């Protein structure tokens, strides 16, 4: 959430001439409604079930850059599945920076409550142990999307050499 996953992912996919996959977009296509609407009508558990289904399908993709929602990697099962088939990269930013980036966005159902700043801190506290299990962890606070993409590309090239 607010770390640049989609922007950076698209840049990397373009550079590598890979397919770009956004799991949130796939979920919306499958559900036939927006993520906000899924949360409103069916709840977070239904959304997480869609995520699980999509992750199960991702293992068959080749030459793809996959951007996941911030909560997808906070599931041990999803993270293990992704790590079997891919280099898992976590883009990171502090709660303050994330808030600065997302505060005007209305499509983030987990931030619709009275105190979204606190919610961001709480979400990151729960998710951080999972995020730290990524193969590559990149702080995006002071880097442009292009700089982050270059860093991830370098890590990808190193991983391919192993």
Regions found by a protein language model. Give the residues of each.
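ATP-binding Walker
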Residues: 3
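Walker A/P-loop
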Residues: 6
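NTP-dependent small-molecule kinase module
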Residues: 11, 15, 61, 125-162
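ATP-dependent small-molecule kinase phosphotransfer cores
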Residues: 22-83, 107-108, 130
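Short glycine-rich anion-binding loops that position phosphate/pyrophosphate groups of nucleotides
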Residues: 70-72, 94-96, 143-144
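A glycine- and Lys/Arg-enriched "phosphate-lid" helix/loop adjacent to the NTP-binding pocket
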Residues: 84-128
